[in-house]
Amino acid sequence: MNLLHWSSPELTLTFALDDGPVRLIGVREASRPDSEDLVPSQPLVEVSATGHGLSPSTNRHVDTTLGQQLRYVRHEETGATLRIIQDDPSTGLRVTSVFEARAGVRAWSEASIAGPGTLELTFLSSLVVGLPSVDAELHSAANSWMAENRWSVRSLRSETLADIVSDAHHHVARSRHPVTNAGSWSTGEHLPVGVLIDRSTPYALGWQIEHNGPWHYEIGESRDGGYLLLSGPTDQEHQWSVELTADTPFSTVPVSLVAGTDRDSVFAALTRQRRAIRHRRPVDDRAPVVFNDYMNTLLGDPTTEKLLPLIDAAAEVGADYFCIDAGWYADGDWWNTVGAWQPSATRFPNGLAEVIDRIHSHGMVPGLWLEPEVIGVRSPIAHELPDDAFLTRRGVRVAESGRYLLDLRSTAARAHLDQTVDRLVREFGIGFFKFDNNTMTGPGTDKGGTSLGHGLLEHQRALLRWLDDLQTRHPDLLIENCASGAMRMDYAMLARLHLQSTSDQEDPLLYAPITAAAPAAVLPEQAGHWAYPISGSTREEFTFALVNGIPGRLYLSGHLNRMTPTELDLIRSALAAHRAILDDLDTLVPAWPLGLPTWTDDWIALSLNGPDISYLTVWHRTPGPSTVTLSLPRSRIDPHFPTEDTAWTYTWTDDTLTITANTPEPSARVLRLTRS
C-alpha cells in the first residue's frame, strides 16, 4: 500500500494512494505512533450528481458512484498546505482535497469539470474520514433559543448503528447517525461540533464545520470499519445543488479536524485550532468589559432619561464599553419597521448625541445594537431598495415574521449597510456593534436561477465578505455576533468577529450550564456571558449572577444606578476577578471535572487550565448544603470570587477535591488553583 503521511503541528494524517479512490485512513496526534490497524475502506471524497447517485441506494451520503470512480492524479505540498487531486475520466470531474496545517487541520473540497459538458452536483463532502470502528461514544449538542450548548453523550452501537452481523454475502448496514442544521441559523438546532471517543482504545476524534448556514455530518458503518462525513448544504437535506462547468468551479465549506486521547484533550485541541484559524486584529487585544442595557434592565426601551444614570453607574464600576441595545431607532413598536437605523427623536429629545457624549465623557467606548440583515415590511427602506436587494423565491420577496431579508450578493443591499454603519461610526464615534439576527431565511433563494440552497450559500458567503470589508474600513471597530442569542455560533462568523453572545437566557440558574458548556463550542475569550445581578436579591443570588460571566467575557447588565454601595462593591470585585482571568484567557483550555453539564445537573464545574494555574468555576444549583468530589491534580486553592468566603469548604485527598456548599440557597464560586 502506498501511504502518504502529512502533519500539522498537532495532527498527522495518513492517506492511502492505491489503485482506487484516495482514502484518509489515519488521523492521530502528531506525537503518537502510527496505528497498526489502518483500515483503507472509506474514500476521501463522496460526490453525487444528477444521473450519478449511490450504490446501494440509501439515505447516506457514502457509496457514491462518482466517489468510487475518482482516481489519484497527484498531490502538491506548498508550505502549510496539501492538495490531493483526483479525476474521474468518464465525466471529466476533478476534485481537489485541500488541507491546511494550523494547530489541527482545516480541510475542504474543490470541484471542477474539464471540457464543454456540465455536471449538476447534488452533494460534495468537505471531508470523509475512515474509522476503524463505530463502537464509540458521540458527544454532540442540541442548541436552541435560551437553551444553548446542551451536550449529551450516546453510544453509537447501542442507539443508532445497530450491529446486524453482516457477512461476506450481504451488504453492510445502511443505517447512519445524521446531524443536520437547516436555514440561515447555523446553530438553530444543533452545534456543528462533535467528538467521537473509541470505547476500546485511548483515542478520540473531534471536528467542527465552519459555515454560517446549513451543514450536515453523519457517522455510519462500512464493511471493515466506519466513516465520519462532514459537509455543508446538501440536496437531500437543504435543497442545494450547483451546476459545474469549465468556467464555474465549486468549493465546499471548510471543516476542522483534531485528535486526542479523551474528551477533554480533544476539546483542548479544538480550542487551539479555533485560535489558529481566527483572523485576530490588534483591536481584539483590548478584551473590554461591555455594559449592555438590555438584559433584565431596559429590555429594548432606552431613553435619555433611563440611559444617563446607567451610563454614570457603569463607568463608576469600571465598564470599558457601553452598548445601547434594541429600540434606539424607533418611537414605539419597531419589529416590522426596522431598516433606516435613524435615532428616535422621541426617545432622545436632545438627540442621541447627548447620550453618546455622556459615554465618551467617562472614557468609555459607545456601542449600538443593529440587525443589519433585515428590513421591516413596513419600513420606508423596503420601498426604496429594489427587489434585487432581497432574497426572493420565484420573484417574490421572502418575508418572515414581518421582515424582508437582504441578499448580500446585491450591490444595493451592501451599499445600504455600508452607508448605515459608516454614518453611525462617523456621527457618533461608535466603536462597538452588537449585530443581531432574529429572522431565519428558510431554505434560501432561487434568484439568479440557482437552487434554493445554493442561493443561500452564496448569500452567506457574501455576508462574510461584507464583514471582512467592514472591518478593513474600520479597524478599531469591535463586533459582537448575536442571533437571538447563539443561533449562529459558528467559526465562519467567529473567525472574524470579536465576541459571541452565548444566550438570551434571563434566569441565572439556567445560564450556569450555558456558561459552563460554552467553551466546547466557542473560545472562552470570545464567549460573551451575561452577568445581570438584580438589586435587592440575596448576596448568594447576586454572586451567582456575576459568577456566570467571569469564566469567559463578562457581559454586564442590570440597574446599576439603583444598587446599594455593597452591591456595587461586589460588582467591582467580580470585574477585578474577571480581568485577572482575562490576562491569561487566550492561553487557557477548557476541561469539565464533572463532565459536560446537562440542563438539569445540580452541580456543574468548568476548569480553564494553563500550564501552572487553573480557574475552576463551580455552581451548586439546588437549595441546601451539599457535597461534591472532583478528580483534579492536587493544587493550592485560593478563592478568586468572591474573595472572602466561609460558606464553601475545600478538602484534598490525594488528587480528589471535596467541595461542600454550606448555603441554604443555590450558590457559585470561582477558584484559582496553583499547581506546585
Region roles according to the model:
Residues 463-673:
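Active-site-proximal substrate-binding groove within the catalytic cores of carbohydrate-active enzymes
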Residues 293, 297-383, 415-419, 458-471:
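Aromatic- and glycine-enriched glycan-recognition loops and surfaces
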Residues 288, 299-301, 345, 372-423, ...:
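Active-site-adjacent "subsite" loops/lids of carbohydrate-active enzymes
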Residues 242-261, 616, 665-673:
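Short Pro-Gly-centered flexible turn/kink motifs
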Residues 289-293, 324, 366-370, 433-435, ...:
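Hydrophobic faces of well-ordered beta-strands that scaffold small-molecule active sites
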